[in-house]
Swiss-Prot record:
Protein name: Oxytocin receptor
Glycosylation sites: 8, 26
Keywords assigned by UniProt, alphabetized: Cell membrane, Disulfide bond, G-protein coupled receptor, Glycoprotein, Membrane, Phosphoprotein, Receptor, Transducer, Transmembrane, Transmembrane helix
Organism: Rattus norvegicus (Rat)
Pfam families: 7tm_1
SUPFAM superfamilies, sorted: Family A G protein-coupled receptor-like
């Protein structure tokens, strides 16, 4: 894949061999060329992805910070998933955007290794935090009495981040600043054995995509079965309650109690399960083309590695970091409603306090009153009760 910007993308390698292109016999006479039209399309797409990912996830974090329900377990996982998406945007999308603009990596060897390391950290973190949130929803539905406690949540998230940092370590050893043509240097992967690219890309695909998807499918299979059981119980209990007679009055009352219990489960948790399921679906849709072309390129020597569709497919993975904030907004719209209300409320108070013609004494008095009463009055006027 020498000469294509996609060669710089995350775990994408010089897939033709296990050595840098400059060491495959004779060096090329000059630096390879690229498709400039395709490069401009890549730059435009990456600019859009970067803007949407940064703005969307920043709004999510701000909304979670200002909500009165910030200690919710679901919101805790949403916060860390948004942080992981920001890591993807800053350390994966942004370097790739700069790389597409400059065509070659311009920087020291240490920066090359660091960028490659952080690119994969974002991939691992986004995947495994989503997996952790899905496991939490599975426990909440299937075994509510054994669901994770707050201390366990924090330890699980901390362990996930540490595991992602460790799992990404091979990038530091594999990538380095190499001479890819006469006088031309780039951040490139080097393998000792010719089967190295196959082994490494296959491992990344298993660790970041195949194994998590299998676990996610098992989680939502269990969740679906439990919900089906509850709905069936609810229907049967409602029928038994409707048939209540004098002889079965106690059974009818018990059935009504069971109906009420099922309703509580549905209202409190089904919506969060739906949200997590849509996030998982977006993850699969966005990452499948990326890993498909990665595996194709290492296992098929005749793969069209420089084709436009091949390269664009690798850009789709980052769309996942753009989709998640919109999914949050769809299912927890009250978060953004509160954020907008607080913004307009604070803006109105600022404008009111900045009216011309007021004396300095009155300004000082108004400012002091605002500071003292901000916590109580602004919360009463600017925030709405959550519907979660």
């Amino acid at each position: 894949m020498e000469g294509t910007p996609a060669a710089n993308w995350s775990v994408e390698l010089d897939l033709g061999s296990g050595v840098p292109p400059g060491e495959e016999g004779n060096r090329t006479a000059g630096p390879p060329q690229r498709n400039e039209a395709l490069a401009r399309v890549e730059v435009a797409v990456l600019c859009l992805i970067l803007f949407l990912a940064l703005s969307g996830n920043a709004c999510v974090l701000l909304a979670l910070r200002t909500t009165r329900h910030k200690h919710s377990r679901l919101f805790f996982f949403m916060k860390h998933l948004s942080i992981a998406d920001l890591v993807v945007a800053v350390f994966q999308v942004l370097p790739q955007l700069l790389w597409d603009i400059t065509f070659r990596f311009y920087g020291p060897d240490l920066l090359c290794r660091l960028v490659k390391y952080l690119q994969v950290v974002g991939m691992f973190a986004s995947t495994y935090l989503l997996l952790l949130m899905s496991l939490d929803r599975c426990l909440a539905i299937c075994q509510p009495l054994r669901s994770l406690r707050r201390r366990t949540d924090r330890l699980a998230v901390l362990g996930t981040w540490l595991g992602c940092l460790v799992a990404s370590a091979p990038q530091v050893h594999i990538f380095s600043l190499r001479e890819v043509a006469d006088g031309v240097f780039d951040c490139w992967a080097v393998f000792i054995q010719p089967w190295g690219p196959k082994a490494y890309v296959t491992w990344i695909t298993l660790a970041v995509y195949i194994v998590p998807v299998i676990v996610l499918a098992a989680c939502y299979g269990l969740i679906s079965f439990k919900i089906w059981q509850n709905l069936r119980l609810k229907t049967a209990a409602a029928a038994a309650a409707a048939e209540g007679n004098d002889a079965a009055g106690g059974a009818g009352r018990a059935a009504l109690a069971r109906v009420s219990s099922v309703k509580l489960i549905s209202k409190a948790k089904i919506r969060t399960v739906k949200m997590t399921f849509i996030i998982v679906l977006a993850f699969i849709v966005c990452w499948t083309p990326f890993f498909f072309v990665q595996m194709w390129s290492v296992w098929d020597v005749n793969a069209p590695k420089e084709a436009s569709a091949f390269i664009i497919a690798m850009l789709l993975a980052s769309l996942n970091s753009c989709c998640n904030p919109w999914i949050y907004m769809l299912f927890t719209g009250h978060l953004f409603h509160e954020l907008v209300q607080r913004f307009f409320c604070c803006s109105a108070r600022y404008l009111k306090g900045s009216r011309p013609g007021e004396t300095s004494v009155s300004k000082k008095s108004n400012s002091s009153t605002f500071v003292l009463s901000r916590r109580s009055s602004s919360q009463r006027s600017c925030s709405q009760p959550s519907s979660a």
